[in-house]
């Protein structure tokens, strides 16, 4: 089966090729891109389109690779032993299966998302090299070799917070999701707001890209933040006249708190709006 996009996700041709290439090579798809460009949603939509169950592992700064395999609950076993619980006779009762164990032992092919791998420490990717490459690992407590019944379709996302090791990169197919151009962005918006008035959308899009192109901006607004802003404009029934107001008492368009997340960026945008009004 090949991924050919979905009704809920605007996938470019090169992104669809990347998904299918990773499946052909039987390698994880490593997806990078700005926050909010749909990296996590890609795995969800591919899984739904290909009718695969999706297992998700969201990485934090404290996450260890072993947690993705399994954890042995020695404390509970010791407590149960002291209480004379019959469960202690079977060590399997104290093995907490991680997401890789679940994916490897699933009775049908699954999609596996390892989300924001760059949040973990630098050794995290290296600690998963063998397991992801060979699709197996050993559980020492139960003396079992856990081997994948069906090779999962693996998605790994990164926000580029830190560089990933070369040895890990060699085992992946890489794709960078570029920030959508205006035409692609309109298609994305149309999926979420099919009835949005063209004039309002055009004005909102101009404002959005004006903000993103501001020199010195600390945090550029993402696709997801544009969608949040449009949702608010629709919910509050903001008219085109209000959005394009020339009233000097109003320093910025309404509800830009969905786009700008610190006071320095708001100040920059206020200056841009002021200069645009002066030039009209």
Label each region the model flagged.
Residues 1-280:
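C-terminal regulatory/interaction module of P-loop NTP-utilizing enzymes
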């Amino acid at each position: 089966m090949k991924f050919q996009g979905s009704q809920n996700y605007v996938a470019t041709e090169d992104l669809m090729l990347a998904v299918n290439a990773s499946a052909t090579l039987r390698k994880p798809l490593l997806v990078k891109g700005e926050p909010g460009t749909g990296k996590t949603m890609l795995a969800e939509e591919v899984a739904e389109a290909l009718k695969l169950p999706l297992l998700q592992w969201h990485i934090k700064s404290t996450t260890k690779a072993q947690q993705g395999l399994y954890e042995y609950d020695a404390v509970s076993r010791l407590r149960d032993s002291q209480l004379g619980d019959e469960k202690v006779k079977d060590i399997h009762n104290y093995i907490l299966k991680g997401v890789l164990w679940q994916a490897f032992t699933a009775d049908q092919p699954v999609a596996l998302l390892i989300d924001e791998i760059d949040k973990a420490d630098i050794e995290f990717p290296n600690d998963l090299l063998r397991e992801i490459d060979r699709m197996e690992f050993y559980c020492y407590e139960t003396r079992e070799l856990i081997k994948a019944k069906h090779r999962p379709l693996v998605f790994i996302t990164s926000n580029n917070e830190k560089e990933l090791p070369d040895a890990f990169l060699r085992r992946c197919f890489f794709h960078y999701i570029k920030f959508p151009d205006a035409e692609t962005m309109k298609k994305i918006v149309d999926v979420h707001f099919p009835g949005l008035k063209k004039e309002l959308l055009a004005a909102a899009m101009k404002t959005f890209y004006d903000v993103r192109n501001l020199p010195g901006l600390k945090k550029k607004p993402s696709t997801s933040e544009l969608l949040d802003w449009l949702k608010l404009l629709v919910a509050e029934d903001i008219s085109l006249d209000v959005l394009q107001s020339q009233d000097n008492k109003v320093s910025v368009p309404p509800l830009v708190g969905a786009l700008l997340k610190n006071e320095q960026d708001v100040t920059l945008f206020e200056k841009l709006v002021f200069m645009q009004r002066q030039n009209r």
